Every structure is written in C-alpha cells, then in structure tokens.
Swiss-Prot record:
Binding sites annotated in the UniProt record for ATP: 16, 165-167, 240, 246-247, 263, 267
GO CC annotations, alphabetized: cytoplasm
Family: Belongs to the AdoMet synthase family.
Protein name according to UniProt: S-adenosylmethionine synthase
Start and end residues of each stretch annotated as Flexible loop: 100-110
Cofactor field: Mg(2+); K(+)
Record text on cofactor binding: Binds 2 divalent ions per subunit.
C-alpha cells in the first residue's frame, strides 16, 4: 500500500464541549468503580447552554452523588463563571440514567469470571508505529501536546486571556513512512475579548507551537493558521452542543489507523469497545517495541456473550521482521484477549478513566497518565519467542 505523502490529525482541548461530556461520563464511571469495581456502567452526557443531561444504563451497589460529580468536573475544566458562558456551580442537571438490561447482563455474567462474555459484538483496532518515542503517529501525538500546552499556560496564568475551548490540527510531510517536516499547524483557541488578534497569534506561535514541535521539523514553507476566523470568545457548550463519544478519532490514532466505531468514555471494562481497544494498543505497542515490526495494526472482534475473540488479524504494512502468521500465534499465546483476561491483564477495574478523557487515550506516559496499556513488559518474551 502506498504511503501518505502528507498526513493530518486533530485534537481538541479539555474545554471542548464533546470532551467535557467525555470527562463527565468518565468521572461518574470512576466514582462508581471506587465503591463497586464490578459495576456495569454505560454513562452518556450531553452539554449545552446552562444544562448537563445524563443518560444511559448503570447497575451498581455504589451510592454516587451524580450532581456533585458533574459540578466538580465542569468547574475543574475551567467553566466556573457565567462570564465564560457556562458555570458548573449553577448549571441545570437532568438525570435520565436507568439500569442495564437483564438480557445483556445474562450474556456477560458467568459463574467463572474467565468465562465472562463480551458485552456486545464489535470490532476494535490497536496500533503502534516507530514515528515517535511513545510509538504513536506524529500528527496526533503533537496535536495532543499542543492542546496540553494550551491548558498548561491557561491554568498557570502565563497567558491569562486563554479560555478552556480550543482545537489543534497538525500536518506532517512523510518520506519512507516517517515524518520529515511540518507543513501546517491550525490552532484555534477561545480567548477573552480584550486580547488583540495580533497579540494572540504571536503568543500562540511562540508560547504554544514552537515549544512543542521539534525545531528541525519547521521549514520555510510551514503554514500557521491561528484563530483563522478571527474572534473566538463564545465557546464551550454555548457555542456548540457536546456529546459523549463524538471524538473517537481524536481519542485514538488521529485517523492513521482504522477504527471499529465504538466510543470509550463512560463505559466499564466489560464493554469491549473500550477494553479491547486498550488491549489492541497494548499488543501493537509491544510488537513494535520488541522489534517484530516497525508498524503494527491489530484487529480483534467479538460476539456478544462469547468470551473468545471471533477473530484476530495483524497488518504490519510490510515492516515485519518475522512472518505475520508467527506474530498472530505469539499474540494468541502471550496475550489473553478474552474480556476477563483483558481486565485482569491491564488492571482495568481501577478508577483511572477520567484522566483518559482528554488529550488521547494512547501514547501518554506522564506520572498521572501511566496507563497500563502503554506498558512494554512483553518485549523480552516476544523477542525470545520470535528468535530476535
């Protein structure tokens, strides 16, 4: 398959309305898992001017204050005053959460935990590449870092006129499957009305873009599109309705890898949309880190109520150092991809999900985002088994 000559990915900030919804859903999931690790949670959130709507299905023994969690999350993101168009302390909260269908539960629950069935049918993908030090595609990796930098400068007060809502988009030129130069950066950030566009553009380029992207990637033709529509004062849920699960490409690989269509946030690990996608990343990252391939995409699929995957497929894009059939055999031998096996392998019953809900679920290795699916603890066993 011909490689892309250029590739673009986007990210959004924690104050983007869709990401607000994701964070609320995952904050509720975390609060429930703290009290009831085996709860069944499917929590959806909608945010719009002055209101948060919760819906979905939750079956749990936990006693959770949904309203308090919503308000704490919204205020923590930075929407804590009516001047910003949304105030977590005064917004209306509508709760429409019910319980999980017993017909779904009977397909998942088993007397022996290892026989736990998948919570639904579906297909999931995992991916890793040698493009960056975290084995992620460069465009999405740097798009996320731009958004994290925007939030850092906003929270620290270094650029006090920044507001929570923002988006980034990064285009890299490629040669031989590797990024070689930065062709374009798009960054739109919400701001106070007093700041001039000239000041904003200079600050964004000098304080956000240049500290994040390696200097050797810039060239004379690099294009900067900073707040290209001009004023961006009205943002967050006032500007756009936000929904859980509407940023699935931002959450994963920025379009560089395939996506099975299932969102992550608000779902407990029995939902393979989430847990199997995490397992896919874990498998692909260990394959690449072990040197079995320079690039790897794995697909797994499931049937509702059935523990074993219905299929496991690998694509190394002609970069494999060993036969792909051997790689699949090693995956089956060394990674338990049954739902219970994934949960145990990656310790997924911990209340850690709110941290995943902004700036990407993959490629993050910070002290508070050292997610288990980013470990490369299978490298030596894979190398030995492959004879490398």
């Amino acid at each position: 398959m011909r490689e892309y000559a250029v590739f673009t990915s986007e990210s959004v900030s924690e104050g983007h309305p869709d990401k607000m919804a994701d964070q609320i859903s995952d904050a509720i999931l975390d609060a429930i898992l703290k009290e009831d690790p085996y709860a069944r949670v499917a929590c959806e959130t909608l945010v719009k001017t002055g209101a948060v709507v919760l819906a979905g299905e939750i079956t749990t023994t936990a006693n959770v204050d949904f309203e308090a969690i919503v308000r704490q999350t919204v205020n923590g993101i930075g929407y804590h005053h009516s001047d910003l168009g949304f105030d977590g302390s005064t917004c209306a909260i509508i709760n429409m959460i019910g319980k999980q269908s017993p017909e779904i539960a009977q397909g998942v629950d088993r007397q022996k935990p290892e026989d736990q069935g998948a919570g639904d049918q579906g297909l999931m993908f995992g991916y890793a590449s040698r493009e960056t030090d975290v084995l992620m595609p460069a465009p999405i990796s740097y798009a996320h870092r731009l958004m994290e930098r925007q939030a850092e400068l906003r929270r620290s007060g270094a650029l006090p006129w920044l507001r929570p809502d923002a988006k980034s988009q990064v285009t890299f030129a490629y040669e031989n499957g590797m990024p070689v130069r930065l062709d374009a950066v798009v960054l739109s950030t919400q701001h106070d009305p007093e700041i001039s566009q000239a000041q904003l553009k200079e600050a964004v380029i000098e304080e956000i873009v240049k500290p994040v992207i390696p200097s050797e990637m810039f060239h004379a033709g690099t294009k900067f599109h900073i707040n290209p529509t001009g004023m961006f004062v009205i943002g967050g849920p006032v500007g756009d309705c936000g929904l859980t699960g509407r940023k699935i490409i931002v959450d994963t690989y920025g379009g560089m890898a395939r996506h099975g269509g299932g969102a992550f946030s608000g779902k407990d690990p029995s939902k393979v949309d989430r847990s199997a996608a995490y397992a896919g990343r874990y498998v692909a990252k260990n394959i690449v880190a072990a040197g079995l391939a320079d690039k790897c995409e794995i697909q797994v699929s499931y049937a509702i109520g059935v523990a074993e995957p219905t299929s496991i497929s690998i694509n190394t894009f002609n970069t494999a150092k060993v036969d792909e059939e051997l790689i699949i055999a090693l995956v089956r031998e060394h990674f338990d991809l049954r739902p219970y096996g994934i949960t145990r392998m990656l310790d997924l019953l911990q209340p850690m999900y709110k941290q995943t809900a902004a700036y990407g679920h993959f490629g993050r290795e910070g002290s508070d985002t050292a997610f288990t699916w980013e470990k490369t603890d299978k490298v030596e066993v894979l190398k030995d088994a492959a004879g490398l």
